[in-house]
């Protein structure tokens, strides 16, 4: 019974550490988060942090895993629920915007701001996230011709890149403004403008 309880405690502690890290990223814009500061925030010793995560990089990877799971699980639901390419793209962008707005600390990771001076592989993980997102947009856009018999005035790869750049811009603007410029601001009007010359 004790072993079971200890097993149950570990994920909770891990979750607590990741939540605290995300909150510190949100509340300390522009600042580097040290393990000493994180340990003080969580109420553990630094040694206790390292019992749950072998390095600070693994803590950041835990947050990146959360971002990927949150976004791509929602994208899978969108693909199952909607068949029109532009409706899918609109919903995917909206998921990104809403996620960003609800998780300001995570935006610092996606914008790269929180990763300055951290392990280089973390930047690689964020790069992979946006590459995967762009590939998803490309697939959706290319299927439009097959599903709907329609094409675009711009090639699908260029449009997919534009949509990802739009999302990245929204996230970066949110971080740069100290979270005052919400990603959802003018989103629908901007989407309509983007699609005006589709």
Curated annotation (Swiss-Prot):
Keywords: Cell cycle, Cell division, Cytoplasm, DNA-binding
Residues of the HTH tetR-type domain: 11-71
Entries under Pfam families matching the protein: SlmA-like_C, TetR_N
Coiled coil: none
Compartments (UniProt record): Cytoplasm, Nucleoid
GO molecular function, one term: sequence-specific DNA binding
Any GO BP: cell division
Disulphide linkage map: none
InterPro entries to which the protein is assigned, alphabetical: Homeodomain-like_sf (IPR009057), HTH-type_Tx_Regulator (IPR050624), HTH_TetR (IPR001647), NO_SlmA (IPR023769), SlmA-like_C (IPR054580), Tet_transcr_reg_TetR-rel_C_sf (IPR036271)
Residue ranges of DNA binding: 34-53
A Gene Ontology cellular-component term: cytoplasm
Similarity annotation: Belongs to the nucleoid occlusion factor SlmA family.
PANTHER family: ACREF/ENVCD OPERON REPRESSOR-RELATED, ACREF_ENVCD OPERON REPRESSOR-RELATED
Function, as annotated: Required for nucleoid occlusion (NO) phenomenon, which prevents Z-ring formation and cell division over the nucleoid. Acts as a DNA-associated cell division inhibitor that binds simultaneously chromosomal DNA and FtsZ, and disrupts the assembly of FtsZ polymers. SlmA-DNA-binding sequences (SBS) are dispersed on non-Ter regions of the chromosome, preventing FtsZ polymerization at these regions.
Quaternary structure and partners: Homodimer. Interacts with FtsZ.
Identification of the protein by name: Nucleoid occlusion factor SlmA
Organism per entry: Colwellia psychrerythraea (strain 34H / ATCC BAA-681)
Organism ancestry: Bacteria, Pseudomonadati, Pseudomonadota, Gammaproteobacteria, Alteromonadales
